[in-house]
Every structure is written in C-alpha cells, then in structure tokens.
Amino acid sequence: YASKTYWIVNYSNPAAIVAKATQILRPNARILNICDMPVEVEARMAEILDTDLSNLEVDYFGLNHYGWFTKVQCNGEDVTEKLKKHVAEYGYVSKASYEDALVKDPDWLHTFTNAKKIVNYFPDYLPNTYWQYYLLGDDIVDYMDINNTRGMQVIHGRETKIREAVKKLENGEKIDLTQFYVGVHGKFIVEVVKALAYDTRSRQLVIVKNDGAVKNLPDDAMVEIPAYITKDGPEPVRVGEIPRFYKGLIEQQDACEGLVVEAVIEGSYKKALQAFTLNRTIPSANVAKEILDEMIEANKEYWVELK
C-alpha cells in the first residue's frame, strides 16, 4: 500500500482489468486509473472542427476501450450532430488530412475511418475507436495480416525506431527529436497529475467505481466517465440511465473483465474460460477454449496456474 498522502496514477493496460483487480486487491490505496484513447479521439474531433482540444468538453460513458461520446461542446456550443454528420461520412479524419493520413499510417487511418460504419449503424452516440474490434470483428479479421499483426507492427515500427535513435545518440550522432515529441497522451497524464497535486478541478475522462454514476449499471463496475479531478481524487459526473443496447454491451464486457480478475485471484480455469467466452472478439466457446489453452502455454512462466 502507498502512503495515504500519495496518489497512484495507473496508466497500464489492460486498464479496465487492472482497475478491477486493484479495487479488490488494494481497496484502501488511492489509485486513479486512466487511459488516453478517448482523449486521442477528442483530438481528432478538434482537428475536424479546426479548433484546439482545450476548447472541447465531452460527455461520455462506458468501460475502458468500450465507451461512447454522448455530447460534444466546443466553446459551449453543442457540436454533437455536426460531428456525427462528419464521422458518418469520413470517420474521425478531417477532410484536409485524409490523404496525408493514408500516407503517414494506413492502419491508423483504417481505425479512424472504421468509425463511420459504426455511427451509421448506431447513430445515437459517437464511438470510441476500439469498438471496431467488438462490433466489426469480421472486418478486422479480413483486414489484418497474420504475418504482420499489430504487435509485430509495434515491435518493428515504433520500438525499432526508438532503439535505433538511442543507438545513434550513444554514438554521438544527431537525430530528429521532433518525431518523439509528446502527443495528447502525455499532455493528458500531466493534466491529471497537476489536478491531483494542485486541486485544479480539471474535467477529465477517468476510470472510477460506478457507485450509481451510471444509474442502471452495477455499482462495482469500473466505468469510464467525466470527473472533476481534485486533491482528494475524482468527483464523477452523474450520467443517469443509459439505453438498453449500450447497457447490455457494457454489462457483458464488465462480467468478462470481472471473471478475468477472479480467475487470476482464484487460479480458476473455469472462470478464465467463462471470461473468454463472454468476450465479443471471440465467436464461440470452442474458440475461447482453444485461445485460452494456447495463451496458458505461451505464458506459463508469467501466469498463475489455472486449475
């Protein structure tokens, strides 16, 4: 346990599962769980609106990587419908940067443009981009290359670039440092930490115990919603009730994540299999068992024994 005067800001993944686990294993520690993906989407919204990110205020509900923007305001003006119209046609990509984004990173462009299909199917709200994996799984499988997975892209892309840059610096060579300048994720965590340290009451999207904030979700769910960050922690914004479709999606994923935590704490193979079966990225119990067994073998040096 950390000192009662300290805050632990958890930026690790999978954030939702880590949040649930720490709630159970360290209930008295002051831990604030955060993720930058909603802020990254907000940055794309700001680009579309040709404004600064600081001018936006959003309403949002869900779990980590599993949420929806219900309202977006720019300098106090409600621009939600304007954004929906744009995203339904272009995704989270501004008209001006569409071609440039394709050249820069086709995989990110694919991610941001996938939002247009989701908005056209489910026009109530604006989605977090991670919904592509849960709602458009067949599209993702068709797009992915088994010989060049996302993990491989990170290893051979960003990680290789960083190692090469470090080696050049060690050899006294000059490099272009601008490629490593902080993005919205770095600015986001600084704003959160500043708010905790200096009681700024900054309004941020964070992961907190529900406790009635989303009225028709379980109180112990770790929900991602707006909160005012103070020296004493987050003061969540009350969301109220959410529609049945979104409630059903979230409750299923919340059950999945809760079972993952229970499986690890109890060393339960049964609960791990139940968790995998509930996950929307896995099409059947047969596939869930196959994936679980392969992951157990691949991670036997790191995982607890599941019996």
Whereabouts are the PLM-identified features?
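Long, compositionally biased stretches enriched for glycine and/or charged residues
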Residues: E47-K307
